Each structure stands twice: as structure tokens, then as C-alpha cells.
Regions:
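N-terminal ligand-binding/catalytic initiation module
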Residues: 1-139
């Protein structure tokens, strides 16, 4: 991406790459709106494509989870692990289990986890995992 772009063109670029990931796009918008004045005053970070690296996970793993419920019925759920950044240490981030979980939500949470972990000053990167599995009422 051209290094002379505006905030809106950067956000449009993120939205176009993953048009159905509204939760993730909203998180990027909130963070970048805050960071943009600093980045305009410090162009060296933009020249290093720091923003493009921040908003693109290093790795996304999608897999199915097959299990047998209490009625002896086979169930299949989707699961993901989003590994956002290992720039300052190994990926660290929890798991979320809820029927509404999808890749956009986990990218949003992993993106935010990267910043939360960086603020601790401990050598931890950011990631998040989860599944659309509903744990309520399960044995």
C-alpha cells in the first residue's frame, strides 16, 4: 500500500480485504483513529509498513471440533486460533466459547490482546482462540 495514504483510505483498505468482518474493522477503526496523529508526525513507522503488519494476523488456524453430546448425537463446531503478533514474545490470549463466535470476533479480540499484552511490558505477543460451541447446559 502507498505510504502517503490517509486514515480513511487505510481503513477502506482493511474493510475491502475482509468485507464481512465488521467487528474486526470497527476495532481497527478505533485504534487507528487514536494512533493516526502520532503516525503522521513519525512517518518512519509508516515507511516500515507497521500499520499493514499490525492489522494482518501472522497466522489463522481454522478447524472443526467433532464431539458426541449427552444424547449420543455427533455434533460439529467450528473453531479458530488467531495468532496476531509474536513481535515481542509468544502468542498469549484466551479462548471464547459462544454460538456467536466467528473469525471477525476473534480477529478483533486478538488485535486488542496484542496491545493489552504489550502494555504489560512482559514479552508476550497477542492471539485469541475460540469456537461457536455453546457450553451452557453441557456436561
Amino acid at each position: 500500500m502507498d505510504q502517503t495514504y490517509s486514515l480513511e483510505s487505510f481503513l477502506n483498505h482493511v474493510q475491502k480485504r475482509d468485507p464481512n468482518q465488521t467487528e474486526f474493522a470497527q476495532a481497527v477503526r478505533e485504534v487507528m483513529t487514536t494512533l493516526w496523529p502520532f503516525l503522521e508526525q513519525n512517518p518512519k513507522y509508516r515507511q516500515m509498513s507497521l500499520l499493514e503488519r499490525l492489522v494482518e494476523p501472522e497466522r489463522v488456524i481454522q478447524f472443526r471440533v467433532v464431539w458426541v453430546d449427552d444424547r449420543n448425537q455427533v455434533q460439529v463446531n467450528r473453531a479458530w486460533r488467531v495468532q496476531f503478533s509474536s513481535a515481542i514474545g509468544p502468542y498469549k490470549g484466551g479462548m471464547r466459547f459462544h454460538p456467536s463466535v466467528n473469525l471477525s470476533i476473534l480477529k478483533f479480540l486478538g488485535f486488542e490482546q496484542t496491545f493489552k499484552n504489550a502494555l504489560t511490558t512482559l514479552p508476550m505477543g497477542g492471539g485469541k482462540g475460540g469456537s461457536d460451541f455453546d457450553p451452557k447446559g453441557k456436561s
